[in-house]
């Protein structure tokens, strides 16, 4: 032997550990991204709902005004 020992089992364990850590990091990043997206989407959803409600209220008022304007006067 020329004094070089290759620890195959150690190398495989190190690679397995490294891939495991990389996979966990990817999961953490994906989880953080999904949480951030949910945090952004929640207020946007509320705003959109409020906006639709406001439009519906305005449309109702307009229809009532138009109906009152064209209704025969007594």
Curated annotation (Swiss-Prot):
Keywords: Bacteriochlorophyll, Chlorophyll, Chlorosome, Chromophore, Photosynthesis, Repeat
Known role: Component of the photosynthetic apparatus which may bind the chlorosome to the bacteriochlorophyll a protein monolayer.
Protein name: Chlorosome envelope protein B
Main localization, broad class: other
Record's keyword annotation contains tRNA processing: no
Origin species: Chlorobaculum thiosulfatiphilum (Chlorobium limicola f.sp. thiosulfatophilum)
GO cellular component, one term: chlorosome envelope
Modified residues (Blocked amino end (Asn)): 2
